[in-house]
Every structure is written in structure tokens, then in C-alpha cells.
């Protein structure tokens, strides 16, 4: 395991942006597999591989770039590594970024699932508030720790590891029709 971590660190040093995006996409996919297998109990025979591929593409092309970029912006908006700075970053993240990101994530998923604009709006109206409240149960303490203890170039990976559970929930929520 230590060798794997060292390899990951070396790749992060050489290609931080690519590695962050690949990590995010892969872990969004893992979240969908967990959602389908453990939450929805589909079984391997009924696993929707196309859905997993869609979720991974959202991770590669939306989650990874957007969250990775957001952390860079946030580090410029709120500087420092103190507890106070970590708290401020968490507040800006959870009040400013999370609501927008979550709405976009659910909307993108609905679009990729073939929902019409009207169906997507109805789904957002039905699911958004519940998902946002669930977000607030999980993410504030994770983000305070992330912003205080974790270097910028590892934040997306740390969040995505925790997010395997979150992604499982989001995949279930986003794909529940």
C-alpha cells in the first residue's frame, strides 16, 4: 500500500491536474457501482454499466476539473493555513460553491439520463433540497479538516475518497426516477 501511495505521489508531482481528474472520475464511478450494488441491490447481472460510464464521465469532465479548479480559487480567496482560514474556506465552500455545484451536478446527470428540460427542473425541485441538506451533514467537518491539514494538491483526492460514500448517495439520488 505504501508503494502505491508513493507512486500516486510521484504522478501527482509530475501531472497534478491529470491525476486529480482521473482520480475524481474513477471515484465517481466507484460511487455509482456502490450505489447500484449496495444501495439499489441490482446484482452484477443487472448492473447498468452505461450508467456507471455516464457517472464516470461526469467525474472526469465536470467534478474533477470544477472542484480541482475551485480549490485553487478558494486558496486565493482565503489565504493561510490557520484554523480560522480553514473555517472561512469551509464556509465559502459550503455557502457559495456547494449549492451551485450540487444543482449543476444533478442537472447534468438528468440531462445525460435523457430528461427533458421540464423533467429535469421537476427532478431538481424534488431532489435538490434533500441533497443539499444531506451535503451539510457530511461536508462541513470534512472540509474543515481538508482545508486545515491537507496540502492543496491533495485536497481533491482526499475529498474524492470521502466522496465515495457521497457519490454513492448522489448517484442513487441523481438516477432515481
Swiss-Prot record:
Keywords: Membrane, Mitochondrion, Mitochondrion inner membrane, Transmembrane, Transmembrane helix. It holds the Pfam family Mpv17_PMP22. Widely expressed. InterPro entries: Mpv17_PMP22. One of its GO terms (cellular component) is mitochondrion. GO terms for molecular function: channel activity. It is a multi-pass membrane protein. The record marks 93 as: Determines ion selectivity. It is found in: Mitochondrion inner membrane. GO terms for biological process: developmental pigmentation; iridophore differentiation; liver development; regulation of mitochondrial DNA metabolic process; regulation of mitochondrion organization; regulation of skeletal muscle fiber development; regulation of triglyceride metabolic process; UDP biosynthetic process. The keyword Plastid does not apply. The chain crosses the membrane at residues 19-39, 55-75, 95-115, 132-152. Involved in mitochondrial homeostasis, and control of oxidative phosphorylation and mitochondrial DNA (mtDNA) maintenance. Non-selective channel that modulates the membrane potential under normal conditions and oxidative stress. Belongs to the peroxisomal membrane protein PXMP2/4 family. It is linked to Genetic defects resulting in MPV17 loss are responsible for the transparent (tra) mutant phenotype. 'tra' fishes display pigmentation abnormalities and lack of cells derived from the neural crest, such as iridophores and, at later stages of development, melanophores. MPV17-null larvae show disruption of mitochondrial ultrastructure in liver cells with mitochondrial ballooning and disappearance of cristae, and impaired oxidative phosphorylation, insufficient pyrimidine synthesis, and mtDNA depletion. This is Mitochondrial inner membrane protein Mpv17. The lineage of its organism: Eukaryota, Metazoa, Chordata, Craniata, Vertebrata. The gene is mpv17.
Amino acid at each position: 500500500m505504501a508503494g502505491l501511495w508513493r507512486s500516486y505521489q510521484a504522478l501527482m508531482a509530475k501531472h497534478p491536474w491529470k491525476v486529480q481528474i482521473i482520480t475524481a472520475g474513477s471515484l465517481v464511478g466507484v460511487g455509482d457501482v456502490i450505489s447500484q450494488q449496495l444501495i439499489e441491490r441490482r446484482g452484477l447481472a443487472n448492473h447498468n454499466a452505461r450508467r456507471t460510464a455516464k457517472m464516470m464521465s461526469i467525474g472526469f469532465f465536470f467534478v474533477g476539473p470544477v472542484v480541482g479548479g475551485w480549490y485553487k480559487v478558494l486558496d486565493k480567496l482565503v489565504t493561510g493555513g490557520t484554523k480560522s482560514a480553514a473555517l472561512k474556506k469551509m464556509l465559502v465552500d459550503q455557502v457559495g460553491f456547494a449549492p451551485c455545484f450540487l444543482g449543476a451536478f444533478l442537472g447534468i446527470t438528468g440531462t445525460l439520463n435523457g430528461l427533458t428540460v421540464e423533467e429535469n427542473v421537476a427532478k431538481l425541485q424534488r431532489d435538490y433540497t434533500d441533497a443539499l441538506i444531506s451535503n451539510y451533514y457530511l461536508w462541513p467537518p470534512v472540509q474543515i479538516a481538508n482545508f486545515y491539514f491537507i496540502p492543496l494538491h491533495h485536497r481533491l483526492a482526499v475529498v474524492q475518497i470521502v466522496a465515495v460514500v457521497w457519490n454513492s448517495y448522489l448517484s442513487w439520488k441523481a438516477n432515481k426516477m
